[in-house]
Structures are given as C-alpha cells and as structure tokens.
C-alpha cells in the first residue's frame, strides 16, 4: 500500500491548557480529528467526508505549554463507503497520544456513497 501520511503541527499555547497546565483534551481532540480529516482528504474530496466515530484516542503522557505537538495521520483501512485514519501525536519526539477515527463518504444529501478507493489502498 502506498503511504500517504499527512503531518500537522500545533504550538501549545496558554489558551490550549486545562486546569493542570497541560494540553486540554478537548483541544487535542479537535486537532486529532482535523489530522484524520486531512488524511482522508488525500483520498476523498473534502465535501464528501463526514466523521462517524472516534474509535480511540489515548493519551500516554501530558503535553506542556510551549511544546510543538506533531500529528501524523494516514488512512489505514477502507470499506465500501468508510475510511479509517490512524493518528499519532508526539511532542519533543515522545508519543503523547494515538488512536483512530472513522469517516464515511457521503453524497450531496448526506447519504453514504462508495468512495471507490478500496482498490487503491490494496496496492
């Protein structure tokens, strides 16, 4: 399978912190979903992608103010209408969060439609 990884980076600022002074999970989730969306957008037009499920999002260490959180994402599985993206976030070289999300390709009425990329992912 051809690798089509997408990398995004975010500077963790004061407004991104929780009451413990570390990256707020809600902000991390926003960036996490955005990274997965960008990976899906490599394969499917953005107007056809909707989030169905955050399968998992696990934090393994806190991310502190001033850190640069690097999120790497790629589509790892495709069904007839769905795509699963795997995301890994690291700060200072250490993995801080990881997980996966599922998107579905939809038509103009919001109904699931085949995306036609399954064969490409098998290459």
Residue ranges and their predicted role:
Residues 2-7, 64-65, 76-123:
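HotDog/MaoC-like acyl-thioester-processing domains
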Residues 37-83, 94-99:
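Hydrophobic beta-strand-centered segment that forms part of the acyl-chain substrate-binding groove
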Residues 1-53, 107-123:
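Hot-dog-fold acyl-thioester-processing enzymes
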Residues 9-13, 58, 102:
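Generic structural detector for well-ordered beta-strands
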């Amino acid at each position: 399978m051809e690798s089509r990884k997408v990398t995004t980076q975010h500077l963790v600022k004061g407004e991104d912190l929780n009451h413990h002074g570390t990256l707020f999970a809600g902000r991390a989730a926003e960036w996490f979903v955005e990274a997965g969306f960008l990976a899906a957008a490599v394969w499917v037009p953005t107007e056809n992608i909707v989030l169905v499920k955050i399968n998992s999002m696990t934090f393994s260490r806190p991310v502190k103010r001033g850190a640069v959180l690097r999120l790497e994402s790629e589509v790892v599985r495709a069904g007839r209408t769905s795509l699963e993206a795997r995301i890994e976030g690291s700060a200072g070289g250490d993995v801080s969060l990881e997980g996966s999300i599922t998107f579905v390709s939809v038509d103009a009425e919001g109904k699931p439609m085949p995306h036609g990329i399954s064969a490409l992912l098998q290459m």
